[in-house]
């Protein structure tokens, strides 16, 4: 969780502000897992910088404020919506993923439906779905509000199916869009929005591993990026 960072009262936003002042234009950053309660306006302001890739991951766990309170989470789902809205204003169709836990203690059918509808409405690019299992030291470990395993697993499977559909839709939307891609092994790379793609270049052009290129998505299945040379 990057947003746990704190130094003299300055969180991740303060850290990124200092870093961005002291690095060159060719450096890129990927901010992966950010707990919602640690994402403030200072951090969102830094994310406007083009050196920060348009790929974000927010572990929301559930979209039910009632269940968030049971789990003693320090954020509301309205704040999560605010973050998503701002990220989409700042970046062009960023990849926004999240973590969701199905069958948290106390989760009713209504709560499960609230979470499903929230994920669908906000069109997350993809999400990791975990069936709840008790973990010692957490507020829910001794909870007596356990959900039947069968129900928990059914909810998890339904969420996974939604994630697969939305992930496919996100990939389809990239066709024809410009992107940055970092070259890796075997002529492949990872784009700024964290998609693995084959790099297409003229036969005479030597792709350098670790190099950053600009290009365009020219194929979706398989994913291919034709780079500018």
Regions found by a protein language model. Give the residues of each.
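Conserved SAM/AdoMet-binding glycine-rich loop
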Residues: 1-109
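Radical SAM enzyme [4Fe-4S]-AdoMet core and its adjacent flexible, acidic
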Residues: 5-25, 71-74, 134-165
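Conserved, mostly hydrophobic/aromatic
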Residues: 31, 58, 99, 119, ...
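Short acidic/polar active-site loop segments enriched in Thr and Asp
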Residues: 53, 125, 211
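Short acidic (Asp/Glu) and glycine-rich catalytic loops that position anionic groups and cofactors
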Residues: 63-64, 96, 134-139, 190
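C-terminal, non-catalytic macromolecule-binding modules
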Residues: 90, 110-152
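Terminal RNA-binding accessory module
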Residues: 142-229
């Amino acid at each position: 969780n990057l947003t746990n960072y704190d130094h003299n009262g300055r969180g991740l936003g303060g850290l990124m502000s200092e870093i961005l002042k002291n690095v060159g234009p060719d450096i890129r950053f990927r901010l992966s897992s950010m707990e919602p309660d640690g994402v403030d306006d200072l951090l969102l302001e830094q994310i406007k910088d083009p050196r920060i890739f348009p790929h974000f991951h927010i572990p929301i766990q559930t979209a039910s404020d009632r269940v968030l309170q049971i789990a003693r989470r320090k954020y509301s789902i309205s704040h999560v919506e605010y973050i998503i809205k701002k990220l989409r204003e700042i970046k062009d169709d960023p990849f926004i993923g999240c973590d969701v836990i199905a069958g948290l203690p106390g989760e009713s059918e209504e709560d499960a439906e609230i979470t499903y509808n929230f994920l669908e409405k906000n069109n997350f690019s993809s999400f990791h779905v975990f069936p709840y299992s008790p973990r010692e030291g957490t507020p829910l470990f001794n909870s007596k509000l356990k959900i039947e395993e069968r129900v928990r697993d059914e909810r998890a499977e339904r969420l996974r199916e939604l994630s697969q559909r939305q992930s496919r839709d996100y990939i389809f939307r990239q066709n024809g869009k410009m992107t940055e891609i970092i070259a890796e092994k075997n002529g492949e790379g990872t784009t700024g929005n964290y998609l693995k793609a084959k790099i297409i270049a003229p036969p005479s052009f030597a792709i350098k591993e670790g190099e950053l290129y600009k290009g365009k998505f020219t194929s979706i299945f398989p994913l291919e990026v034709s780079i500018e040379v």
